Amino acid sequence: MAKAIPKKGSRGRIGSRKSTRKIPKGVIHIQASFNNTIVTVTDVRGRVVSWSSAGTSGFRGTKRGTPFAAQTAAGHAIRAVVDQGMQRAEVMIKGPGLGRDAALRAIRRSGILLTFVRDVTPMPHNGCRPPKKRRV
C-alpha cells in the first residue's frame, strides 16, 4: 500500500552538503483532482521546499484518488518541513477531489499553526464548454 520513508542519513553524502535553511512560515498548496492529490510546500517567496503526491507515496491506479492517499501524501510533505522549523503556514486548496478535507486534516494534526485556509479552485465565468457527461 503506502511506501515507508527511509530514515534520514541512511545513505548520505560524506563531506559538505547544502545547508538546510530555517523556514518559520510557508504556504501549503493542495491540488486535489479526482485521480490524484498533490501537496506542495513553499516558502513565502514561492520557492518549493517539499512536495509529495499520492503516487509518490506508493499508491497506484484508482487508489491515488482516495482520501487516505491524500492524507498520506500530506503527511510525507509536512514531515520534511517540520524538521526545518516551520511553525506557521497558509493553505491554498485547489480542485474538486476527495482528498481536499483529508489532506487538510492531516496538516492540522501535524502541529503547524494555520494562519488561513483559502479555496483557490479556478471557476470559469462561462468560459470553455465542459466535456460531455459520462454514460456508464
Curated annotation (Swiss-Prot):
One of its GO terms (molecular function) is rRNA binding. This is Small ribosomal subunit protein uS11c. Keywords: Chloroplast, Plastid, Ribonucleoprotein, Ribosomal protein, RNA-binding, rRNA-binding. Its main location: plastid. One of its GO terms (biological process) is translation. It is found in: Plastid, Chloroplast. Belongs to the universal ribosomal protein uS11 family. One of its GO terms (cellular component) is ribonucleoprotein complex. PANTHER family: 40S RIBOSOMAL PROTEIN S14/30S RIBOSOMAL PROTEIN S11. Part of the 30S ribosomal subunit. It comes from Lactuca sativa (Garden lettuce). Residues 1-22 are annotated as: Disordered.
